[in-house]
Swiss-Prot record:
The lineage of its organism: Eukaryota, Viridiplantae, Streptophyta, Embryophyta, Tracheophyta. Its cofactor is Zn(2+). SUPFAM superfamilies: ClpP/crotonase. It comes from Gossypium barbadense. NCBIfam families: accD. Its EC number is 2.1.3.15. This is Acetyl-coenzyme A carboxylase carboxyl transferase subunit beta, chloroplastic. Pathway: Lipid metabolism; malonyl-CoA biosynthesis; malonyl-CoA from acetyl-CoA: step 1/1.
Length: 497
């Protein structure tokens, strides 16, 4: 049986299809005559760029794809398509990529059911003619170079129809010059001279007149890509990083070294010795204390959404652990939970953590990533600034204990104005956005333009706003040395009771 497979590659705005072909058995399908001319000018251009395999006794060319494919993932997985050839004969195609099977079926009842189901997708003029072939079922296999070219024409046409249904073609492309030599499928599968060599790959690039085509943006596609790829936030990069490899690299862009946002769980894993994390107050929640009114959605519903999305109950995780064997108390804010905004539960969890560290004489580390106080709780969220600052005063001034504040991007608003800037040592990450009020708020309030980079960590470091700028890679070692410098040492087997 002839084997075929497809891979889709999305790279730098271009869609490339790669088709690999290999032969193993002799089989061929009866010819389907190509007697009519496609009225679609775009399709005509496509046919011009595909080798004419006139000597082939078995081929499909100009096959229309009648069933719209909703998702590009369906094309490279097992699926059934409804097509018609230039003689208006209709067939269903079953494409099994795993077992490398390509089957044709012209069963009338099945086609009628498909036509009825997909009627809304296509013009009824496509559905006027029945199948003229008496054979109910075919296996389409490669035989020789001529048949190969017929197969290639058929696959080319299927891909053409699929791309036309999935890709938005710019009006300037559609109205391009008739003298254009490049169709949006500029390379054909048959290769030079129409000969397909065994084991060779061929590229199909979606481009016309040098202009790239763009994929339709659907919420499902965007959600899928967000789960696989992360775009760099640096204005000079915007590179795309594979999510799985990015996690192993501490969420640092592989292309420019920019420090991307991290989930609180990843930061805890980065900072704490494995197996030593002990969370605190995980079940602490609050309701809607001021019954905040919103035209968009209820405050409670919004909290429920972020709880499901992040798996957290609030915008911070607090607990205890060991830093290279040194017991510490640590709190890590999570920007993915409503922008890391501070509300009553966040303030209460931080306050309880500080009090626990005070009573147990533990060094304290707070990792800040927040947009400020949460407006949905009004003054109740603002009062957390004073409550946390009061607890820190007792911890630092009365007990003389050691507190390290780590400012990540972004750290703004009430967090900056309270515990974010109260550390004995204040550490910032590279390129972190640190401010009290955001750039847009300042410009709208003062009616003045804020210079670019004036709220970046590197600029503020030279103004003396904090102590060191420490990348993520050596951060754990730096924290360990600072804690030991202030009189906290690792536990040993003799001190454990």
């Amino acid at each position: 049986m002839e084997k075929s497979w497809f891979n889709l590659i999305l790279s730098k705005g271009e869609l490339e299809y790669r088709c690999g072909l290999s032969k193993s058995m002799d089989s061929r399908l009866g010819p389907v005559e190509n007697t009519t001319v496609n009225e679609d000018p775009t399709r005509n251009d496509t046919d011009k760029n595909i080798h004419d395999c006139s000597d082939s006794s078995s081929y499909y060319s100009k096959v229309d794809h009648l069933v719209d494919v909703k998702d590009i993932r369906n094309f490279i997985s097992d699926d059934t398509f409804l097509i018609r050839d230039s003689n208006q004969d209709r067939y269903s195609i079953y494409f099994d990529s795993e077992n490398q099977i390509f089957e044709l079926n012209n069963d009338h009842s099945f086609l009628s059911e498909l036509e009825s189901f997909f009627y809304s997708y296509h013009n009824s003029s496509y559905m006027n003619n029945g199948s003229k072939n008496d054979e109910p079922h075919y296996h389409f296999n490669l035989y020789d170079n001529d048949t190969n070219c017929g197969w290639n024409n058929h696959i080319n046409s299927c891909i053409d129809s699929y791309l036309r249904s999935q890709i938005c073609i710019d009006s300037s492309i559609l109205s391009g010059s008739d003298n254009s030599n490049d169709n949006y499928i500029s390379n054909y599968i048959c290769g030079e001279g129409g000969n397909s060599s065994e084991g060779k790959n061929f590229d199909i690039i979606t481009r016309e007149n040098g202009n790239d085509l763009t994929l339709k943006e659907s919420s499902n596609d965007l959600d899928l890509y967000k789960d696989l790829w992360v775009q760099c936030e640096c204005e000079n990069c915007y590179g795309v990083n594979y999510k799985k490899s990015l996690n192993s690299k501490m969420n640092i862009c592989e292309q420019c070294g920019y420090h991307l946002k991290m989930r609180s769980s990843d930061r805890i894993e980065l900072s704490i010795d494995p197996g030593t994390w002990g969370p605190m107050d995980e079940d602490m929640i609050s309701l809607d204390p001021i019954e905040f009114q919103s035209e968009e959605e209820l405050y409670k519903d919004r909290i429920d959404f972020y709880q499901r999305k992040t798996g957290l109950t609030e915008a911070i995780q607090t607990g205890t652990g060991q830093l290279n064997g040194i017991p510490i108390a640590i709190g890590v804010m999570d920007f993915q939970f409503m922008g890391g905004s501070m509300r009553s539960v966040v303030g209460e969890k931080i306050t309880r953590l500080i009090e626990y560290a005070t009573n147990n004489f533990l060094p304290l580390i707070l990792v800040c990533a927040s947009g400020g106080a949460r407006m949905q709780e009004g003054s109740l969220s603002l009062m957390q600034m004073a409550k946390i600052s009061s607890a820190l005063y007792d911890y630092q001034s009365n007990k003389k204990l050691f507190y390290v504040s780590i400012l990540t991007s972004p750290t703004t608003g009430g967090v900056t104005a309270s515990f974010g800037m109260l550390g004995d040592i204040i550490i910032a990450e590279p390129n972190a956005y640190i401010a009290f009020a955001g750039k847009r708020v300042i410009e709208q309030t003062l009616n003045k333009t804020i210079p670019e980079g004036s709220q970046a960590a590197e600029y503020l470091f030279h103004k003396g706003l904090f102590d060191p700028i420490v990348p993520r890679n050596p951060l754990k070692g730096v924290l360990s040395e600072l804690v030991q410098l202030h009189g906290f040492f690792p536990l040993n087997q003799y001190s454990i009771k």
